[in-house]
């Protein structure tokens, strides 16, 4: 299922989230199971199925990582359920540095400064990865698509690391 087609949006990494939300509400009005209360069981089941598809499409397109995974899947590169990691040595070294910095937060003289530095570092890195990803996603070349998949893997790692940083920050407030 091409969710971009479902929502009548161009296949692109950047999505107008207001337009997406408007189209989501519009689709929900047409497929919501309540509209089929007096319909046959088969029509009710179909309405439930369509509603689930619209909901999944909306969740996929509003999340940049899931959107990128969907774009790759449309081009035959399905990484949505994989466990493969990035084999980029420089990225692996950066991961280790970030993890060490996360562990230092509780012992740092100024943990809030360290947290701010990590947020800045994460944000800068995510911007670089996202810019590269946008370029690679428009390609039809298999090597570029595999490189795009690696960029998505990096973003997934960064999302997990961001959650860990938020937890560390919350722990300081407790």
UniProtKB/Swiss-Prot annotation:
Annotated InterPro entries: DnaJ_domain, HscB, HscB_C_sf, HscB_oligo_C, J_dom_sf
GO CC aspect terms: iron-sulfur cluster transfer complex
Query: Which GO MF terms are attached to this record?
Result: ATPase activator activity; protein-folding chaperone binding
> Which CDD domains does the UniProt record give?
DnaJ
Q: Does the keyword Transport apply?
A: no
**What are the record keywords, sorted?**
Chaperone
Q: Name one GO biological process term.
A: protein complex oligomerization
Domain of life according to the entry: Bacteria
- Enumerate the spans annotated as J domain: 2-74
Role this protein plays: Co-chaperone involved in the maturation of iron-sulfur cluster-containing proteins. Seems to help targeting proteins to be folded toward HscA.
- Subunit structure of this entry? Interacts with HscA and stimulates its ATPase activity.
Check the record and name the HAMAP family matching this protein. HscB (MF_00682)
Q: Which PANTHER family match?
A: IRON-SULFUR CLUSTER CO-CHAPERONE PROTEIN HSCB (PTHR14021:SF15)
Q: Which family does it belong to?
A: Belongs to the HscB family.
Extract the NCBIfam families matched here: hscB, PRK05014.1
Provide the protein name: Co-chaperone protein HscB homolog
- The species is Shewanella amazonensis (strain ATCC BAA-1098 / SB2B)
Q: What is the gene name?
A: hscB
């Amino acid at each position: 299922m091409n969710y971009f087609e479902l929502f009548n949006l161009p296949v692109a990494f950047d999505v107008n989230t207001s337009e997406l939300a408007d189209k989501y509400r519009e689709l929900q009005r047409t497929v919501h199971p309540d509209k089929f209360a007096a319909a046959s069981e088969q029509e009710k089941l179909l309405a439930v199925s369509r509603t689930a598809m619209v909901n999944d499409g909306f969740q996929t397109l509003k999340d940049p990582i899931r959107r990128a995974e969907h774009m790759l899947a449309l081009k035959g590169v399905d990484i949505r359920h994989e466990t493969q990691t990035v084999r980029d040595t420089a990225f692996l070294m950066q991961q280790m540095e970030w993890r060490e910095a996360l562990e230092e937060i509780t012992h740092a003289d100024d943990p809030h400064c360290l947290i701010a530095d990590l947020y800045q570092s994460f944000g800068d890195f995510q911007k670089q990865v996202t810019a590269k990803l946008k370029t690679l996603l428009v390609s039809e070349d298999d090597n570029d698509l595999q490189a795009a998949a690696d960029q998505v893997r990096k973003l997934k790692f960064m999302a997990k690391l961001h959650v860990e940083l938020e937890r560390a920050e919350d722990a300081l407030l407790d």
